[in-house]
């Protein structure tokens, strides 16, 4: 077990979430080259902080501090929304473990999943949060996963079975929905 020995309080006085989520120089050569030569186009778009904030501002203020509320990002990319959601939950008094346990997401590209996990760890470190890194990784591996969201059962948090996918396809053909 790896225990992070930072203080228990988030020092948001010196932490700037807008700077942390800045993607103005995001299309680095490394990132662009990871997508070159791939067999499929991902049509990735990484949401700038201003849009992330504007969308998250639409969430009821009381939801951020409610430990029973869950947040789901069906295509989390590099984690812009996920990181902001976790940060905002922490700012509203939710502990790190609950913030992670109530945040779910699906992403098609495995490298983006790894990047998101790493960004969350960096967020915790930057905020000086005392957390268990192994436990945090276990939660992220369960809740922030790599899969095609079209074949993911969000209600039961698992992939659809082949039979379920056939039933869904059949229903779409007969009802158009």
Language-model features: locations:
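SAM-dependent methyltransferase catalytic region
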Residues: 2-177
């Amino acid at each position: 077990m790896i225990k992070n020995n930072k203080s228990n309080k988030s020092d948001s006085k010196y932490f700037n979430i807008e700077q942390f989520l800045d993607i103005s120089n995001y299309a680095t050569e490394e990132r662009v080259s990871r997508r070159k030569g791939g067999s499929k186009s991902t049509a990735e778009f990484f949401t700038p902080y201003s849009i992330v904030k504007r969308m998250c501002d639409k969430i009821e203020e009381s939801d951020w501090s409610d430990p029973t509320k869950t947040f789901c990002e069906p295509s989390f990319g590099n984690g812009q929304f996920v990181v902001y959601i976790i940060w905002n939950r922490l700012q509203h008094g939710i502990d790190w473990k609950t913030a992670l346990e109530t945040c779910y997401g699906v992403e098609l590209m495995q490298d983006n999943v790894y990047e998101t996990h790493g960004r969350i760890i960096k967020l915790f470190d930057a905020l000086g949060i005392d957390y268990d890194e192994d436990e945090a990784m276990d939660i992220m591996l369960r809740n922030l996963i790599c899969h095609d969201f079209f074949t993911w059962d969000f209600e039961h948090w698992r992939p659809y079975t082949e039979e379920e996918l056939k039933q869904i396809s059949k229903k779409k053909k007969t009802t158009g929905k």
